[in-house]
Amino acid sequence: AEDPDGCCTLAIHAEDPEALAGLDAGKLNRVSLARRTFLKPWQEYTMNDRVQWCVAAVPAPSWAAKVFPELPVEEAVEKLWQVIFDVCRVSTGDPVTAWQEHVAKTKARRDQLNAWNLDHVHIVSSNGTDLTVGLADDATWEGASSKTDGGIEFIANVPTEEVFCAPHRERVNGTVYGTKPYVYNGQLIEGWHVTFKDGKVVEHGAKKNASLLAELLSTDENSNRI
């Protein structure tokens, strides 16, 4: 639309996690950068909540097969549909009420985090993760739902369980180990880890597609920061 204000956008994803496996990581990264440049006007509208927007996923056979490799593909797709219905609260019998209750609980958690006025978050895990993330000055916690400039409330991600806050770009230190594969440019980065010092990545690695991770972290001057 010439004037997108007042419009809504819905993105439905059905991705193959390894659709581009084996292709040159550098070329894929350049394609991704070009795509982001082309979509920048749309992203400015959505990321600034000027319009209502939502991202949701539906099963693709290749994705379902990755999640449930022990099942025949058709059964895997059906099972993944059921998982999506469950986590999206479709299976509750009254999804609208279920979402209203979930949003209320998430907002309560968000408000508690803001009341604590945290300086930083320290994340530790049995897999070796030990990461301290300093929060940006005057940062606030957000989550659950958003509002457009016109005051219309909407949920941007279905499902969503997160509350989030902006980190300080120079106050991130430690190492994070991924517990799940990371899908980037149609390829899987598996067994990955990233180490930060003063907000900048100083060491990284992966058991699979380490070169793709390196390309991702060298996309531009700020891509090696959290």
Q: Which role fits each region the language model picked out?
A:
Residues 1-173:
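Active-site bordering "gate/hinge" segments
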Residues 176-177:
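Tryptophan-anchored aromatic micro-motifs
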Residues 183-187:
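Short loop/turn motifs at secondary-structure junctions and domain boundaries
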Residues 180-182, 198:
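Beta-strand elements of well-folded, non-transmembrane domains
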Residues 135, 167-168, 188, 193, ...:
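Solvent-exposed, flexible loop/coil residues
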Residues 203-226:
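Dual-mode signal for accessory low-complexity, basic/Gly-rich regions
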Residues 190-205:
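Active-site and channel-lining beta-strand-loop segments
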